[in-house]
Amino acid sequence: MKKGTLLSVRELKTYFYTDSGAVPSVNGVSFEVKHGETVAVVGESGCGKSVTSLSIMGLVRSPGKIIGGDIRFNGRTLTTISEREYRKLRGNELSMIFQEPLTSLNPLFTIGNQLGEVILQHQQVTKEEAKQKGIEMLKKVGIPRAEQVYRSYPHQLSGGMRQRVMIAMALACEPKLLIADEPTTALDVTIQAQILQLMRKLVKENDTAILLITHDLGVVAEMADTVIVMYAGQVVEQADVFTLFATPAHPYTQGLLASTPNIHASGEKLQSIEGTVPTHETMPKGCRFFPRCPHATEQCVHQEPPLMKTGRGQHVRCWLFDGKEAASG
């Protein structure tokens, strides 16, 4: 792995096996996350971004299975370690904030029970020390009356408070990598801004890397250093955040940005991407985006493009850039 690389994903393939056959949810995904870097993975629902994060966490369960590729984290190959070794990593060096905090927290146990368990699992401390560390973490994420919240049940807290609890749990053991899967879903814009500000602050303090899974381009612009755009289980574009927003290369990325509401475009018709993401049964033979692409050619219909490098340093899976330097790996 390159110097400074914390997470390296190479040609990851995660399939789900159904009565009608194997469904490739993630198909040949490759990317890296460096120490202290925030990488955003964006795309429509069903593009494979959440399955990618679950694959990294070792949480893909039957009928799903990782059938190919390599995941390396901090020098270790995760695709070959045992579940017992994975449990030592999860919540410790490798943490995740899930989409919905209400369903991610156990309603039968107090916040203190659940937060304390994470600390006791990974640190050599007493129950009292774990309690004090838990209360300290709740205060750190901006929760008032932390002692009272520690004794509370999830249903007694608001959505924003529950999400802060999830962040406290994820960061309790100072992980090297935090995977945040739609961390601000279903939160109002004020709470969303507070959560994003909180994540930036805590990550800066601990030099934690973030893999941010989202469909919200506003969150991406605010948080990310690097952006990965996924479509139908593949990476279709990768670039630094400034390049991607200034000069999007792939027609799908261009469509995503064009369909984002703009407060300065009053009275203008909101653009959209025609069509829908293909299913396993309707997956095109060539480029997966060609049925929805305004620039599609005959080559796009019959040949699947590789990931190529543009003159601006972006990596893009599109025949419009054929002849440019091909992306390595």
Regions picked out by a protein language model, each given a short descriptive name:
Residues K2-L6, Y15-G28, L59-K65, I81-E85, ...:
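A short, flexible loop at the N-terminus of ABC-type nucleotide-binding domains that lies
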Residues G4-T5, P144, Q238-G329:
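Short catalytic/signature loops enriched in Gly
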Residues G58, I179-P183, L187-E268:
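P-loop NTP-binding/switch modules centered on Walker-like glycine-rich loops
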Residues I66-T77:
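Conserved ABC transporter NBD signature motif
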Residues R76-T77, E128-Q148, L257:
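Conserved ABC ATPase "signature" region
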Residues L78-S95, Q121, T243-P248, P278-P284:
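ABC ATPase NBD coupling module
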Residues A172-K176:
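A short, proline-enriched helix->beta-strand linker immediately N-terminal to the Walker B motif
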